[in-house]
Regions:
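Cysteine-nucleophile active-site neighborhood
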Residues: 1-38
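Amide-donor transfer/coupling interface in amidating biosynthetic enzymes
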Residues: 36-153
């Protein structure tokens, strides 16, 4: 929600995420990679994204970036995953802060959304993904957060 508010406050907008060809509603929920949007982007965060960078996605919207935003990273389903507006404002449409307890809480509280996106086995799928990626990606996610804080200081 913070990335959406940041973009909206700067003149952007938010709309439902749609599948490109069918224009049917699409949601991103679960672990998947983000990747650099442009090779020319010199943002320090970009270097962390050169390798596969799995993060947790949990949204059904996309951000229409304002003209002042610079797109840094995308995913296969949603172009607007990481962006900056000026040197001190960054928007993330994914979750690097997540731990197993948080995922389990979200799974418990968001069952309807999970089922609508992933089907009846959605809760099981998310728990399995968390076991697969949670601890394995912790170091890279902490490095991402540390680099982001360095950029903001």
């Amino acid at each position: 929600m913070g990335a959406q508010l940041l973009a909206y406050a700067a003149g952007g907008d938010i709309e439902m995420l749609l599948e490109e060809l069918s224009r049917q509603p699409l949601a991103e929920i679960g672990w998947d990679n983000i990747f650099p949007h442009s090779l020319e982007n010199n943002c320090k965060l970009r270097t962390l994204l050169d390798l596969p960078f799995p993060v947790l996605h949990w949204h059904g919207d996309r951000i229409i970036l304002p003209n002042t935003a610079e797109l840094i990273a995308s995913s296969c389903r949603c172009k607007e995953q990481l962006f900056s507006i000026g040197p001190l404002a960054y928007g993330l449409q994914f979750h690097v802060e997540i731990d197993e307890e948080m995922v389990n809480t979200w799974i418990k509280e968001d069952q309807k959304f999970i089922s609508s996106v992933l089907g009846a086995d959605g809760q099981f799928i998310l728990k399995q993904q968390q076991k697969e990626f949670g601890s394995k990606t912790l170091a890279s996610r902490l490095e991402f957060i540390s680099t982001l804080f360095d950029l903001l200081s």
